[in-house]
Swiss-Prot record:
This is Nitrogen fixation protein FixI. It comes from the Bacteria. It is found in: Cell membrane. The gene is fixI. Belongs to the cation transport ATPase (P-type) (TC 3.A.3) family. Type IB subfamily.
């Protein structure tokens, strides 16, 4: 199928067309660290599970490729590759040639592409042409069926042939190009049986016309193509509708911005050409093009895309802003801190597309089935033809039955069973403020029966307040703040905020996750953290969190803190209970503090004073007991248990390592994102199983009917197209059911009490 790429994209295909230079591909790739890079390519003529297997197989055969994944919904392939293999610098052009050798066009992905709209226009025009031709041929056929004489019948047959031929060539080019491309490279896809069926139907009709036969099936061949094109057009539209969350998010990024040069001159520059360090002017009413830091100006910023909150946030000099946020009231001068491809919007889009392309167990099964389905269909059609020839000896009837079998057994429904649900579910979760980093994570989340939550920053908002500052001397507070500067832990941040500006203390600094900070200075060894870490002993119990400042294990000061639970925490725990899920707390804080919070939230199982290793051990013990646990955590010390869990989640405020380790990231302050994500994932799993049942049930019923000769090619085309649309519409129920009956957002999910087991 031909698709028009943007002018920035250079097509790579057979026929000697120009391809991007190796250096261009290097610049377009993303550095992942560890000698790995990631490149995104568009593959506009990939349609089915066979295409996925072919492209991924061609790339994985390359020693430079670490992994490759095709996203059929966006028709893109993501390649993670090694910068060097055997001391030789990798040439990324090899990846494009490997794809082209399998018969697929490919070009560098450009965020500004609108090929989907062009394809939709081409499909609609093809539907119109085939529909017009089918209508006119049908009128001629009615005259023939009404008892026209032989000469008139032959004339009408020839007129029908002249109408059908160009219509099949023009409107059927989508199927013919794809089928020929597959056959030429020694493989099959779902368009091969369609092209065979349409061609055989037309060929048989032409043979009858030349031989002055009584019956011709030009109307059937063109009408068959008409219904097939309707199905493909609706499928394309439904996929686009399923991806509305991603396309809407992409539109939040402006095309460009005004860049201020050092000499004061201004230039409008495309967003892809903005580099870190550039000074930008963002006027009121404009969206922030890339992540940046405010150099001057004060304004209200709509950050709903970041945190889901409708209330504007005031930003001023020194504050950070994210790409896609809307500047409401005043002009801002920014310094870009990231390129467009590394900014917030690009990161979120990447997460959602990773969710779409994730290889969950069901999707692997569907892809494997679709890969072997096409050869099986051809064999079945051949056996059907041979069988009817042996039974009746009528070539025409045997051929018609074989054509019907070719059409009715198209694996479209099976290939769509999983990915379309993942697309809709990822979009639904995004609308609820939850980012999915891997499509398989939704499947794992639907299986959990236990939720283990960290305390500070997860069950609480992670902004503790120092409550006994009046009891601590300014000198000790300043010393503690100078040590706390080296940590992002919420308690360290609270000490810094209470002390004001503080210069970092000089010395050999070491942060021990789950314990505290140690600084070796000329005066001795300062420690700031838990009592056991700082002074090697226990102290009086209290219901407040504390941090001890010590010098050579001698206590200098005790800092006490209060932290507020996250909004809707208790309601979220109750919602988890209604889902039949047990809850527990994993915390490194003192037992009295954890017990008090657990009691207030109605959680009976809790663990206190745990090290990162002990948290992993608790999670492993739950797994050994047969439980599948979701771990929700935010800190550096939570990263090991997040990776060890069956599935994991972190708030957007989490430390970078925590967000990277988690499978889900929730953007809102409310903990209601947790039951919302579980409910959505469970419902998505139900729809996937339903889609499998629909696809398999369709084949179990339709294939025997076609083999027995009870379905004409036209009926087969209608049935095949309908099966694909049923699967897509069933997936779209996820949007309607959650919005109407199971909570439109995490907040309404909790307040309506709509979570059901």
């Amino acid at each position: 199928m031909s698709c028009c790429a943007s002018s920035a994209a250079i097509m790579v295909a057979e026929g000697g067309q120009a391809s991007p230079a190796s250096e261009e591909l290097w610049l377009a790739s993303r550095d992942l660290g560890g000698g790995l890079r990631q490149t995104e390519l568009s593959v506009p003529n990939a349609y089915c599970g066979t295409c996925i297997a072919t492209i991924e197989g061609a790339l994985r055969a390359k020693p430079e490729v670490e992994r490759a994944r095709v996203n059929l919904s966006s028709r893109r392939v993501s390649i993670v590759w090694k910068e060097e293999v055997g001391g030789r610098r990798t040439n990324p052009c090899d990846f494009l040639h490997a794809i082209a050798e399998r018969g697929y066009q490919t070009h560098l992905f450009s965020p500004g592409e609108e090929e989907g709209d062009d394809l939709l226009k081409q499909l609609i025009l093809a539907v119109a042409v085939s529909g017009f031709a089918a209508t006119n041929i049908m009128l001629l056929s009615v005259s023939v069926w009404s008892g026209a004489d032989a000469a008139t019948r032959d004339l009408f047959h020839w007129i029908s042939a002249l109408i059908a031929g160009p219509a099949l060539i023009y409107a059927g080019r989508f199927f013919y190009k794809s089928a020929w491309n597959a056959i030429r490279h020694g493989r099959t896809n779902m368009d091969v049986p369609i092209a065979l069926a349409v061609s055989l139907s037309y060929g048989m009709s032409l043979h009858e016309t030349i031989g002055h036969g009584e019956h011709a099936w030009f109307d059937a061949s063109v009408t068959l193509l008409f219904f097939l094109l309707i199905g493909r057009t609706l499928d394309h539209m439904m996929r686009g509708r399923a991806r509305t969350a991603i396309s809407g998010l992409a539109r939040l990024s402006p095309r460009g911005a005004t860049v201020v040069h050092p000499d004061g001159s201004r230039e409008y520059r495309a967003v892809d050409e903005i580099n870190p360090g550039d000074r930008l002017i963002v006027a009121a009413g404009e969206r922030v093009p890339v992540d940046g830091r405010v150099l001057s100006g004060t304004s209200d910023l709509d950050r709903s895309v970041v945190n889901g909150e409708s209330s504007p946030t005031v930003v001023t000099t020194g504050d950070t802003v994210q790409a896609g946020t809307l500047n409401l009231t005043g002009p801002l001068t920014l310094e870009a801190t990231a390129a467009a491809r590394d900014s917030f919007i690009a990161e979120i889009i990447g997460l959602m597309e990773a969710a779409e392309g994730g290889r969950a167990r069901y999707r692997r099964i569907a892809d494997r089935a679709a890969r072997y389905y096409s050869p099986a269909v051809h064999l079945l059609a051949l056996l059907t033809f041979v069988g009817w020839m042996l039974v009746e000896g009528d070539v025409r009837h045997a051929m018609l039955v074989a054509v019907a079998v070719l059409i009715i057994t198209c694996p479209c429904a099976l290939g769509l069973a999983v990915p379309v649900v993942q697309v809709v579910a990822a979009g639904r979760l995004f609308q609820g403020g939850v980012m999915v980093k891997d499509g398989s994570a939704m499947e794992r989340l639907a299986e959990i029966d236990t939720v283990l939550l960290d305390k500070t920053g997860t069950l609480t908002i992670g902004k503790p307040r120092l409550v006994n500052a009046h009891e601590i001397s300014p000198g000790r507070l300043a010393t503690a703040a100078a040590i706390a500067v080296h940590s992002r832990h919420p308690i360290a941040v609270a000490i810094q905020n209470s002390a004001g500006a503080a210069s970092p203390i000089a010395g050999d600094i070491r942060e021990i996750p789950g314990a505290g900070i140690e600084v070796k200075t000329e005066d001795g060894v300062y420690r700031l953290g838990s009592r056991d870490f700082a002074v090697g002993g226990s102290g009086p119990d209290g219901r407040q969190s504390e941090a001890i400042l010590s010098l050579d294990f001698r206590e200098l000061a005790c800092f006490r803190f209060e932290d507020q639970p996250r909004p809707a925490s208790r309601e979220s725990i109750e919602a988890l209970g209604r889902l039949g899920i047990a809850t527990g707390i994993l915390s490194g804080d003192r037992a009295p503090v954890v017990a008090a919070l657990a009691s207030s939230l109605g959680i009976s199982n809790w663990y206190a004073e745990l090290s990162p290793r002990e948290k992993v051990q608790v999670c492993a013990a739950a797994a050994e007991a047969g439980h599948k646990a979701l771990v929700v955590g935010d800190g550096i010390n939570d990263a090991p248990v997040l990776r060890a869990a069956h599935v994991s989640m972190a708030p957007a405020t989490a430390a970078d390592v925590g967000r990277q380790a988690a499978d889900f990231v929730f953007m809102h302050e409310r903990l209601s994102a947790v039951p919302f994500a579980i409910e959505t994932s469970r419902h998505a799993g139900q729809l996937i199983r339903q889609n499998f049942a629909l696809a398999i049930g369709y084949n179990v019923i339709a294939v025997p009917i076609a083999i027995l000769g009870y379905a004409t090619p036209l009926v087969a085309a209608v049935a095949m197209s309908s099966s694909s649309l049923v699967v897509v519409f069933n997936a779209l129920r996820l949007k309607r059911s959650l919005a109407a009956g199971r909570g439109a957002t995490p907040g309404t999910l909790i307040h309506s009490g709509a979570v059901t087991s």
